[in-house]
Structures are given as structure tokens and as C-alpha cells.
């Protein structure tokens, strides 16, 4: 559903943002 899509988008956004900031810990 929409909530699932938003959740995935949020996680992807955080991952991309962290990568742009200099790399995030791999989880």
C-alpha cells in the first residue's frame, strides 16, 4: 500500500543522503 511505498522511499532517501554525506554504516 501507500504506507509501504512511503516507508521504502524514506529508507532509500536516508541511505542516499547518508551516502552523499560521506558513507553510512552498512546494516
UniProtKB/Swiss-Prot annotation:
Coiled coil (residue ranges): none
Compartments, record wording: Secreted
A single GO cellular-component term on record: extracellular region
Keyword annotations from UniProtKB, A to Z: Amphibian defense peptide, Antimicrobial, Secreted
Domain of life from the UniProt record: Eukaryota
Secreted recorded as keyword: yes
GO BP term, pick one: defense response
Chief localisation class: secreted
Sequence intervals crossing the membrane: none
Tissue expression as described in the entry: Expressed by the skin glands.
Keyword Ribosomal protein: no
Protein's job: Antimicrobial peptide.
Family: Belongs to the gastrin/cholecystokinin family.
Protein name in UniProt: Caerulein precursor fragment R7
Organism expressing this protein natively: Xenopus ruwenzoriensis
Amino acid at each position: 500500500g501507500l504506507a509501504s511505498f512511503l516507508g521504502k522511499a524514506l529508507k532509500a532517501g536516508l541511505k542516499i543522503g547518508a551516502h552523499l554525506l560521506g558513507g553510512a554504516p552498512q546494516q
